[in-house]
Amino acid sequence: MIDRIPMSVRGNKKLKEELLRLTRVERLDVVKAIEVAREHGDLKENAEYHAAKERQGMIEARIMDLKDKLGRAEVIDCLQVSCKRVVFGTVVVLLDLDTDEEVTYQLLGPEESEVKAGSISVLSPIGRSMLSKEEGDEVVTKTPGGTREFEVVEIKTGDFA
């Protein structure tokens, strides 16, 4: 069974660019670094060689991870989602009922969420608690810091990740 991964168009493009960079640049660079390190002789105590091999392993693992995620990606155009309810890709304006401050988040996948940039994962506690809510609904979220309460002020389309 393949679990689909919701991903924005921008997030999908970013992962494809990273995969391209890893396969066309970094993979080749690390192979050259291994060759150069081999020329220095004894591989048992060759720190350069071992560091390059370790880097190669990390690059190959990331390539496999990216191929897996891209293969399971369900690409969603955040500018085309419905704004009737909170769903993946929507931009949600919330009123924090404790502080009376407004916060704005875009719900994205775990691979592309960045709280500082205003995007949160649909799998995060607040992301899960917002799903399917409508404007005017109350959102109660249990976080490690305690229970937080918000009101959904506005739901709109956007792509500001």
Swiss-Prot record:
GO terms for biological process: DNA-templated transcription elongation; regulation of DNA-templated transcription elongation. Keywords: DNA-binding, Transcription, Transcription regulation. One of its GO terms (molecular function) is DNA binding. Transmembrane segments: none annotated. The keyword Transcription applies. InterPro entries: GreA/GreB_C_sf, TF_GreA/GreB_CS, Tscrpt_elong_fac_GreA, Tscrpt_elong_fac_GreA/B, Tscrpt_elong_fac_GreA/B_C, Tscrpt_elong_fac_GreA/B_fam, Tscrpt_elong_fac_GreA/B_N, Tscrpt_elong_fac_GreA/B_N_sf. Belongs to the GreA/GreB family. Necessary for efficient RNA polymerase transcription elongation past template-encoded arresting sites. The arresting sites in DNA have the property of trapping a certain fraction of elongating RNA polymerases that pass through, resulting in locked ternary complexes. Cleavage of the nascent transcript by cleavage factors such as GreA or GreB allows the resumption of elongation from the new 3'terminus. GreA releases sequences of 2 to 3 nucleotides. This is Transcription elongation factor GreA. It comes from Desulfotalea psychrophila (strain LSv54 / DSM 12343).
